[in-house]
Regions:
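Extended, subdomain-level signal for the structured scaffold at the beginning of enzyme domains
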Residues: 1-75, 84-93, 105-113, 121-159
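Short, thiol/selenol-centered motifs that function as redox-active sites or metal-ligating centers
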Residues: 78-79
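Cytochrome P450 catalytic-domain "roof"
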Residues: 118
Length: 159
């Protein structure tokens, strides 16, 4: 099966209808509270404002990230969202990155100003400019390097 068939979105806002910070309407597949995470391989926090504070305020999100990180399951965050992982103590002693305006919020982390940073089961990216390498790294982790290479070629990403 492809990654698309096994990917779903969950809303942390209490509504399946989400309006992004850039006024893009998204309909999540479920509310975060409705998901059975036992078969989930990776949790991704998308970041942005007000998305990041909404993620930080959702107990299901924070409990799930903590459980995943502590059990060795994959957790990823981009833009401002790595600050949520830091606030939970999940970046303590780990290499990480975040949007430049949030790097000072990565308490306990070894901060790198790079597109994507992987440390064990935690992957972080600095923001929209790193979204493609971030996504390709997650594909590599879940489906292997051949699939990541195939997608990179298909989207003509030469970075």
């Amino acid at each position: 099966s492809s990654l698309r068939e096994t990917t779903f979105s969950a809303s942390a806002s209490g509504s399946r209808e989400i309006l992004s910070s850039h006024k893009i309407r998204i309909t999540a597949d479920a509310l975060a509270e409705e998901v059975d995470y036992s078969d989930v391989d990776l949790v991704v926090l998308p970041g942005g404002i007000p998305g990041t504070p909404n993620l930080a305020a959702n107990k299901t999100v924070t409990d799930t990230c903590t459980a995943f990180a502590k059990s060795g399951k994959k957790v990823a965050a981009i833009c401002a969202a790595p600050s949520v992982l830091a606030s939970l103590g999940l970046l303590e002693g780990k290499n990480a990155t975040a949007h430049a305006g949030f790097q000072d919020k990565l308490a306990g982390a070894i901060v790198h100003d790079e597109e994507v940073v992987v440390d064990g089961n935690i992957t972080t990216s600095y923001g929209l400019g790193g979204a493609i390498p971030f996504a390709l790294e997650l594909v590599r982790q879940l489906a292997g390097p051949a699939e990541a290479d195939r997608i990179q070629k298909a989207i003509a990403y030469r970075h």
